[in-house]
Regions:
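A short, N-terminal "cap"/entry segment at the start of jelly-roll beta-barrel domains
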Residues: 1-22, 35-36, 118-120, 142
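Residue at a beta-strand N-cap/secondary-structure junction
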Residues: 55, 200, 251-252
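A ubiquitous short alpha-helical element
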Residues: 37, 119-127, 177, 204, ...
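N-terminal regulatory/effector-sensing and dimerization cores
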Residues: 17-115
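Amphipathic alpha-helical segments enriched in hydrophobic/aromatic residues interleaved with Lys/Arg
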Residues: 104-159, 163, 189-191
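Short, leucine-enriched amphipathic alpha-helices that occur as contiguous helical runs
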Residues: 182-190, 234-238, 242
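Basic/polar phosphate-binding segments, predominantly the helix-turn-helix DNA-binding elements
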Residues: 159, 163-170, 176-178, 194-196, ...
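Short helix-to-turn junction characteristic of helix-turn-helix DNA-binding domains
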Residues: 193-196, 245-248
Length: 286
């Protein structure tokens, strides 16, 4: 990433909070101090650490990201982020671009088809080459020209997707929009779980909905999310509960929020909440 672009971002980004930019689907996070592990749901997106370093915990796996790799999240994934080293002089800057599946499909329709490879383990850590980084650099610089964003942003984003699809890992992105691929089916399953948080999961029914055997569904679900379907649902429930508690503040009714996200037992909810976030839900109100 061009240092001039980094300096420009440092002048406009707020610290220690997420900023949604004028480019649709493009977000930034700038941290000027270390932070404990923060749990959140990463929407389907491409993420790049433009400056500094951060650790991402996905299930039991920990990956360290700098500006040499991007993070590819094909589905909504519960993550924890840990920034060990950040300061006012050397902030950590993270870019996130939501995946535009319609745009990816359009590009695939216009480019020569390639022989598909086996689905394999998806993986979230991809090497980041100069051509992709240069395209992101131009997308960021476009923020200085707001009148050009409507026309040029989509062209640059198309180039980014084209280069990602042409890269060694391109088939992993392609699978996300190809009907019948394992990735596409698991993406449908995660969407269903997210939109039915307060309902119990029947794995057999969910596997059937995706046209997969139960064993195959379990295998591919865990390859992509690093969690079992039940673990995935629990993480989403707890993160949604945390969001609701923050929204309602002092007026939050913990037992009602627990029921809203699918917990029948408030005590079980409190135990699992504290296990994930390190504090009880009631202490969030203080």
């Amino acid at each position: 990433m061009n240092q001039e672009t980094i300096d420009r971002l440092l002048n406009i980004l707020p610290r220690n909070q997420t900023l949604e930019s004028a480019v649709s689907g493009l977000f930034f996070y700038c941290a000027d101090k270390p932070s404990k592990a923060v749990s959140y749901i990463q929407e389907p997106s491409i993420c790049i650490v433009l400056q500094g370093e951060r650790e991402i915990y996905l299930g039991a796996d920990c990956q360290r990201f700098s500006n040499s790799h991007l993070m590819f999240c094909p589905v909504n994934i519960p993550l924890s982020m840990h920034i060990k080293h950040a300061s006012v002089e050397n902030p950590v800057i993270v870019l996130s671009m939501k995946l535009n599946l319609a745009m990816i499909r359009e590009i695939l329709a216009q480019t020569p088809s390639k022989t598909p490879t086996a689905n394999g383990h998806l993986g979230i850590k991809w090497p980041l080459d100069d051509a992709i980084m240069a395209a992101f650099d131009r997308l960021i610089r476009l923020l200085d020209y707001p009148n050009d964003i409507e026309f040029l942003a989509s062209l640059i984003q198309q180039e980014i997707y084209y280069r990602l699809l042409s890269a060694e890992q391109g088939n992993k992105l392609r699978q996300l929009v190809v009907d019948g691929s394992h990735t596409h089916r698991i993406a449908q399953a995660t969407d269903w779980i997210k939109s039915h948080l307060n309902e119990p999961i029947m794995v057999e029914s969910l596997a059937s909905r995706c046209g997969m055997s139960v064993s195959g569904f379990h295998q591919h679900f865990k390859e992509i999310t690093q969690l079992s379907p039940l673990q995935y649902q629990k993480s989403l429930r707890l993160m949604e509960a945390k969001r609701l508690i923050k929204i309602h503040g002092q007026g939050a009714q913990i037992s009602q929020i627990a029921m809203q996200v699918g917990y029948e037992s408030p005590s079980q909810f409190s135990r699992e909440y504290k296990r994930l976030f390190g504090v009880s839900p009631s202490s969030e109100l203080m």
